Each structure stands twice: as C-alpha cells, then as structure tokens.
Amino acid sequence: MAETSSSSSQTTPETGTYAIVEASGQQFWVQPNRYYDLDRLHADVDAKITLDKVLLVKNGDAATIGKPYVQGASVELKVMAHRRGQKVIVYKMRPKKKTRRKNGHRQELTRVMVESISVGGKAIS
C-alpha cells in the first residue's frame, strides 16, 4: 500500500493563519483570500470593511486569545456581492382542519472576501 504525505505548503487550520471574528451576531472562522457569506451589510460592492471584534488570531504556532476581544486586531474585508440564500419553506398545518399555510423565505446575504488579518497595525497575512 502506498503512503501518502501531506504537503506542508498547504494552509491547514492547524498550521495556517486564521482568525475568529464576530459579525452579524455570529462567530466566523476566517482565513485570508477566502470568501464568506454574512448577513446583509449596508455597504456598496467593492467597498472595504474592517471588523474589529476579533476573538482569536492564530499565526503559525502563535495564538492570541482575546478577553473578550484581541486589542489592536482587525480583519479587512472586501464586499464582493449582495445575494440571497437558498429558499426555506415553512409549512404549517392543523390536522383534521382545513388550515394550511405555506411561506417561503430567502435570507439576504453579503459575500465578502478576507483580504488581510492584522494585529497591532501590522498585517500578518
């Protein structure tokens, strides 16, 4: 049986640079040069957004944990597009009655690209 070895140049969650940020009342694990869907933000397409509520920053082997936030840490985002999520169907029915209600909902989302993670004004990615 052939052995497989993983390349050390790949960015994995254990060895790479990442941050855990708070946005839209949720926590997101973000890595540079990846995109994420957040709840709709009031920003134009191609606008830059800075998130200052950073809970954790990991750079290689060094990790910085905030209490509750890391001081001087920020994540730079670029708004790529405004979009809508998948449709969720809500169906309510009362048995033995002629009561049925069907509603659909699509969440308004903003797709953002993580451009950089910085601590103390110095970009680490």
From Swiss-Prot:
A matching Pfam family: Ribosomal_L21p
GO BP annotations listed: translation
UniProt entry keywords in alphabetical sequence: Ribonucleoprotein, Ribosomal protein, RNA-binding, rRNA-binding
Cell wall biogenesis/degradation in keyword set: no
Superkingdom to which the source organism belongs: Bacteria
GO MF annotation terms: rRNA binding; structural constituent of ribosome
Similarity-based family: Belongs to the bacterial ribosomal protein bL21 family.
Function: This protein binds to 23S rRNA in the presence of protein L20.
PANTHER family for the chain: 50S RIBOSOMAL PROTEIN L21, LARGE RIBOSOMAL SUBUNIT PROTEIN BL21M
Record's subunit section: Part of the 50S ribosomal subunit. Contacts protein L20.
Name under which the protein is recorded: Large ribosomal subunit protein bL21
Source species: Synechococcus sp. (strain CC9311)
